[in-house]
């Protein structure tokens, strides 16, 4: 704001001395003041600078929030991959064993021990079992897959390096969720409670050429190996020593009991 003042002019000079004397003395006169307000254009740069600084602050704040959110996302992914998935994998992997009475090999019941590694894939709905070489005989080492999506079971006899495929027997094999719950309940101990053994007999029927039709899980197990289909023998018969020469046994468990799978007519 600008302030401008003006002094008033003398109107006239009187002839007499009194008037001259009075006129010679300066008389107080009211000054005229004019107030000038600065033009609006002169104030705009100040407002523009303030507005620009506020917009810049908002941009920096937004960028900071984006960086913070990205950091939280990457931290969550890291924790999920390296902690949650690792814990989930540990919960789905079991190294366990079972004690059972062997009433098949001899007339005298002897106590046997069977160990196996079990991986249960709940989302994919299949089970993978690895039976190592038995310490006291009684069967071949094998890798077994129970694919509940395809309804198939595949046996990879490691001794023969051959694969055998048959329809999944749901009366013997527990579904992944039930089998997982069973193993979680006994995870505190090393072995399952002492149990018994049953026997099932399979017969080789035909060679399988198209392994991809068996599903991806069985395909990866049997790819590059001779693969045959099996048929479950309807009537059980006692396998004597002479007949057992043409059969291979795989002992495993996917339930509360042990199963001996005899694969006869092995090519």
From Swiss-Prot:
Q: Which residues cross the membrane?
A: 55-75
Q: Name one GO biological process term.
A: negative regulation of neuron projection development
Keyword Transmembrane helix found: yes
Provide the positions where the record notes the PTM Phosphothreonine.
Answer: 37
Q: How does it sit in the membrane?
A: Single-pass type II membrane protein
Establish whether keyword Iron is in the entry.
no
Q: Which Pfam families match?
A: BRICHOS
GO cellular component terms, semicolon-separated? extracellular exosome; Golgi apparatus; lysosomal membrane; lysosome; perinuclear region of cytoplasm; plasma membrane
| Molecular function GO labels | amyloid-beta binding; ATP binding
Site location (Cleavage): 242-243
Question: What is known about what this protein does?
Answer: Negative regulator of amyloid-beta peptide production. May inhibit the processing of APP by blocking its access to alpha- and beta-secretase. Binding to the beta-secretase-cleaved APP C-terminal fragment is negligible, suggesting that ITM2C is a poor gamma-secretase cleavage inhibitor. May play a role in TNF-induced cell death and neuronal differentiation.
Entry's family note: Belongs to the ITM2 family.
Q: How does it assemble?
A: Interacts with BACE1. Interacts with APP. Interacts with STMN2.
Q: Can you say what this protein is called?
A: Integral membrane protein 2C
- Species annotation: Pongo abelii
Its gene is ITM2C
